[in-house]
């Protein structure tokens, strides 16, 4: 649902030996639209004490985020769906706002929500392993129109009743064990540069479980180095030359420290 029907998510046994035996794999042959126009949790929704980030295909109907000024994609539909990382349904004012922004009546709007502390929440966040690679590529100013296909995988994090711990585990699954393979048009040099810059190890904040990093910044999420939000390992294939480039590595010790 988060991918707008343009991607597939599967759960399968881990590749090789690992303490965490099941991994999510995400594939899309239209990854820019699937990941950035739909799955990316970029729509901030709030009312009084309620706050959540919205993802899902309804975002491309509303086009409220600056990101859409850079995406050559528009959508129209009589129904809309928004996915929230939240433990409760949105209040009526948020429902009304989203319905109006999407151009649908409230009875044609569906919200799907799951708390981060749940298994469903773990699946939703870890399932963004391909999306974070696309978002990082965008932040690096790589031409999005050159990304033609993508595959990514990461371990399913065990849920935890504490929000910060649960959030940390879902992020660590990607930061320390996520692997993304992008297929791109353009020169081999551009593909190599992208592979080298994509991995999370390029971040100044790399090297500790995410929950520790979050606490070190006193819960101020936006003070964390944005380049941390990337897969641990990147593989980029230049489809016009057939060359493949790799960078980064999985860190099982940090993953074990996070997952417990």
From Swiss-Prot:
Biological process per Gene Ontology, one example term: one-carbon metabolic process
Keyword Metal-binding: no
Keywords, ordered alphabetically: Cytoplasm, Hydrolase, One-carbon metabolism
Gene expressing this chain: mch
Signal peptide: none
Reactions the enzyme catalyzes: 5,10-methenyl-5,6,7,8-tetrahydromethanopterin + H2O = N(5)-formyl-5,6,7,8-tetrahydromethanopterin + H(+)
Location of the protein in the cell: Cytoplasm
Gene3D superfamilies, per the entry: Methenyltetrahydromethanopterin Cyclohydrolase, Chain A, domain 1, Methenyltetrahydromethanopterin Cyclohydrolase, Chain A, domain 2
UniProt source species: Methylosinus trichosporium
Pathways involved: One-carbon metabolism; formaldehyde degradation; formate from formaldehyde (H(4)MPT route): step 3/5
Enzyme Commission number: 3.5.4.27
HAMAP family, per database record: McH (MF_00486)
Protein known as: Methenyltetrahydromethanopterin cyclohydrolase
Matches recorded under InterPro entries: METHMP_CycHdrlase
A GO MF term: methenyltetrahydromethanopterin cyclohydrolase activity
Entry GO CC: cytoplasm
Family statement drawn from the similarity comment of this UniProt entry: Belongs to the MCH family.
Cited function: Catalyzes the hydrolysis of methenyl-H(4)MPT(+) to 5-formyl-H(4)MPT.
């Amino acid at each position: 649902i988060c991918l707008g029907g343009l991607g597939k998510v599967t759960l399968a046994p881990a590749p090789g030996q690992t303490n965490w035996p099941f991994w999510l794999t995400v594939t899309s042959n239209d990854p820019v639209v699937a990941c950035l126009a739909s799955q990316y949790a970029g729509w901030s929704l709030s009312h009084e004490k309620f706050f959540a980030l919205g993802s899902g295909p309804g975002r491309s109907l509303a086009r409220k985020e600056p990101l859409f000024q850079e995406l050559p994609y528009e959508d129209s539909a009589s129904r809309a769906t928004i996915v929230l990382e939240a433990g409760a349904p949105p209040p009526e004012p948020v429902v009304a706002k989203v319905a109006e922004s999407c151009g649908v009546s409230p009875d044609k709007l569906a919200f799907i929500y799951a708390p981060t502390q749940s298994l469903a929440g773990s699946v939703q966040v870890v399932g963004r392993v391909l999306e974070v690679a696309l978002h990082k590529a965008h932040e690096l100013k790589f031409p999005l129109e050159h990304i033609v296909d993508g595959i990514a995988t990461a371990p399913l994090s065990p849920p935890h009743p504490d929000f910060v711990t649960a959030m940390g585990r879902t992020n660590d699954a990607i930061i320390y064990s996520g692997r993304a393979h992008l297929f791109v048009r353009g020169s081999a040099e551009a593909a190599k540069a992208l592979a080298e810059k994509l991995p999370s190890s390029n971040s100044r904040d790399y090297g500790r479980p995410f929950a520790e990093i979050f606490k070190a910044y006193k819960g101020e999420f936006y003070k964390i180095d944005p380049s941390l939000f990337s897969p641990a390992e990147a593989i980029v294939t230049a489809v016009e030359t057939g060359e493949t480039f790799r960078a980064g590595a999985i860190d099982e010790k940090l993953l074990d420290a996070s997952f417990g």
